[in-house]
Amino acid sequence: MVEIKYQVTATNSFGSYEFDVNEDLAQIELNLTTSLKPWYHLFVIHEGKQVGQILITHKQNARQVLIGKTVATSSATVFPSLSLVGHWEIKFFASQIDAEIEELTISRTDHLNAPLVDGESQQDVVHELASNLNKTGWLKGDFHTHTIYSDGMMTRQANLESAKNQALDFFVTTEHNVVTALWPRQDEVAVYGGCELTTPFGHTNFLGIDRPLLDATGMPGFVDEQALMAVIEANQGNGIMSINHPFLDPWAWTLDVPLAYVSSMELINDPTYRDNDAATIKAFDLWSALWNHGWQITGIGGSDSHLLPDDKYPDADMPSLIGDPATYVFVETLTRDNVLVGIKAKHTKVSRFGEINLVSQDKGDILPGEQLTTNVRNFELQLPATTPAGYLTEWILDGTVVATSTDLTSTYTITSDIDLNDYHWLRADVKDQNGVQQATFTPVFWGHRQPTITTYQEVLVND
């Protein structure tokens, strides 16, 4: 065994451990120990190619990392390598350093034979894409989840069990800055690769990715706005970008990103977290402003689940669960690419209490996000029987509440004095007794509006 200790400070937060492997090992085992407070980002590089990432947060002070030739002998955030012979480098940087000196210890054990097995590493969900061609239409998912490989409390298997209990068809795994790529193999819930880019300027998800967001050659990649923008630009086309909890302090989104980069926005984030009621209301107001400016951003939800299923936050009256809220996406069949197509097409509904349904007597079933003809003016929103008593449906036309109802089935008609040849949009929000949105759908619309603003901060300044 080889053991190396590094002293890390706020002004010296970067380091690198290099070594060579000259024989045909079955596995390299790393054991990392740290002081508890900082976050450590580590990048595993083999012969100049990044093959893995590791995150140690304030929730851990130790992590075992298996670097193997197969999925089964590799840790969740490390892709297997055909051969381990060659030059290796473990680059790292620390953030959130409070003490004058922190310490990181890296211990390395080389296994020539009999590699250790990670019992939950069975399928590479980034490259071996899950699909279920028998699932079609409106499917239930979650776009914001965490495990023990960032700051969550659940294992991969526990996440899957919780998702099954919540009747999810799919979810995206979105650790902070790393990709949890290796998962247990099962057929009930599709798991797709993602990553929550976690920065001093807010958090944003990249959903349905085919490679990690961060490249160690540009480490750390987000310490200033210019570097963060470079990371975002480099990942255009690597899944889709979705801004997370835009008004949830201290993780609110502040970077003045071009809106052309953003496909969707998280409207409802973990509704059991104490500060999210106010943040949710602000997110919906921003969503209306974006649509009024002609930026038709898709609305989604994310549980941001960090806790065990039986745990809850202080002052919360219910546990924080994966699938709360759920996002329903209309797909041809369940594949990763079809889910992304559904988001880009704006065919989404978000709900905490069951699936809602939008119809029109002028057209029949309507897909959220659909551009409608001028003769479609009559709408009906159907809420499930599981809707809590006292919830209020608000119909919103161009950002203004135009009708309300407390019935499970509510209707709205656009009057003839409104010219639907012009640009208009319509959605309905379902609110609880405190006026906080619990369900919605991405608006339907008419006409076209060319945006005159181009960046995120411009919307905040102008509305």
Identify the residue ranges that each predicted region occupies.
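Surface-exposed beta-strand/loop patches in noncatalytic accessory domains
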Residues: E3-T11, L32-T73
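Charged catalytic cores and adjacent phosphate/nucleic-acid-binding surfaces used
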Residues: Y6-V8, V44-I45, Q64-L66, D110, ...
